[in-house]
Amino acid sequence: MDFDLMVLRKRLANRGFQAFVCSDIKEAIDLITKSLLNKNDSVVGIGNSMSIRELELTNFLSSKTVYERNLTGSNEDERKALHADIYFTSANAISYDGQIINIDGTGNRVAATCFGPKHVVFVIGKNKIAESLEKAIERVQNTAVLMNLQSIT
């Protein structure tokens, strides 16, 4: 199904999110590094996410303190990421009406998005959009969980 990303953007805005639509990875990196990442954001948290890894975001953060468990394997870094100035993560799925669905093995990403840094940036690819909440949950159960298992084994 082909989704109108501007409609989804408006629906996210109606839920209190500021959403941006990028045409490719380069545009997403430019948006993050030139607009979203404030010069005062000295501490950056990164949730374990294949979408974030695809951006190779850590390559653009050399002047920042970065807490990402993938870099160190440290649970302590997961805790420190909760207090970052800005936190980057992805979602397992998003419904076309703007509901973000995340199921998390250890809870670090969900905790950070709900109770952590003041600024949270979700990087969500078109492949994660589902036509309804039910289809989004189905995507999580049948696709995202399996992909996450493959990425950690």
Regions found by a protein language model. Give the residues of each.
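N-terminal active-site beta-alpha-beta segment that forms phosphate/nucleotide-binding
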Residues: 2-88
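Conserved phosphate- and dinucleotide-binding cores of soluble alpha/beta proteins
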Residues: 82-153
